[in-house]
A protein has these predicted regions:
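Ligand-binding cleft/hinge of the Venus flytrap
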Residues: 41, 54-63, 126, 130, ...
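Extracytoplasmic small-molecule ligand-binding "clamshell" domains
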Residues: 24-91
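Alpha-to-beta junction loops
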Residues: 63-64, 80-89, 132-133, 168-177, ...
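Flexible hinge/capping segments at coil-to-helix
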Residues: 117-133
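Periplasmic-binding protein-like
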Residues: 33, 109-116, 183-224, 241
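Extended ligand-binding regions for polar small-molecule ligands
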Residues: 51-60, 120, 127, 138-140, ...
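Short helix-initiation/N-cap motifs at beta->coil->alpha
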Residues: 51, 66-77, 121, 138-141, ...
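A ligand-binding cleft/hinge motif common to bilobed small-molecule-binding domains
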Residues: 91-99, 145-148, 173-200
């Protein structure tokens, strides 16, 4: 009986080891689901362009993608502390960020725009923000841009939607946000418009830990493949057309 038990136990262990050998590696992906259409919550689950994109990259690289939603200003610290393996969150590569993390090739080009109430306060350009109270997303490019304008009172929010609600409630004069999320909020909120001006173009990229050269190569190769096989354009058409 003992011998039979040992045989069964050994077979179970061998089966477990065999299955684990074929199991996909997990890749933990940090994001901030407050940035539609790139990442947002739907029925409590993060979805959006960035989420679909990283899922497709995972298929090419043979990784099981696990999405970890958190505050935007916590993403890079989480990456450095190895709580996640990479970050995709409509994040722009900036000189300040590249001091601590590395970025893949760009996957999307955007720009900063100004959202105002229709027909109010004469804001037509970034120069017109002087002396105004302006909402931005904490740590986003808009925060960096507006903070450099003299005479602006910057109101920082953890979610873009909170800034939009503050604008509608007359608590602030404008919101500076990336172009595609801004268009998304305009469609959902009557009485708001985008000023006919845009800031300098910026490029979104995936952040990884410095010196993680193997993952960098895998991601860059997968991005190149997805841009050439038609899948990237499918995602563009799905979320932006």
């Amino acid at each position: 009986m003992k011998k039979m038990f040992k045989i069964i136990l050994m077979c179970s262990l061998l089966l477990t080891l065999s299955l684990s050998a074929f199991a996909k590696k997990k890749l933990y992906v940090g994001t901030n689901a407050e940035f539609p259409p790139f990442e947002y919550l739907e029925n409590g689950k993060p979805v959006g362009f960035d989420i679909d994109l990283v899922e497709e990259l995972g298929k090419i690289m043979d990784y099981d993608i696990k999405i970890v939603d958190m505050a935007f200003d916590g993403l890079l610290p989480a990456l450095q502390m190895k709580k996640v393996d990479l970050v995709i969150a409509g994040m722009t590569e900036t000189p300040e960020r590249t001091k601590t993390v590395s970025f893949t090739q760009p996957y999307y080009t955007a720009s900063q725009v100004i959202i105002t109430r229709k027909g109010e306060n004469g804001i037509k350009s970034f120069d017109d923000l002087k002396g105004k109270k302006v909402g931005v997303m904490l740590g986003f490019t808009g925060d960096i841009v507006v903070s450099k304008i003299d005479g602006v009172k910057v109101e920082r929010y953890n979610a873009a939607y909170a800034g939009i609600m503050a604008l509608k409630a007359n608590k602030i004069d404008a919101v500076v946000l990336d172009s595609e999320p801004a268009k998304n909020f305009i469609l959902q909120n009557e009485g708001l418009e985008i000023a006919q001006t845009e800031g300098a173009q910026e490029e979104y990229a995936i952040a990884i830990r410095k010196n993680d050269t193997q993952l960098m190569e895998q991601l860059d190769n997968a991005l190149t493949e997805i841009k050439s096989n038609g899948k990237y354009q499918e995602l563009i058409n799905k979320y932006f057309k």
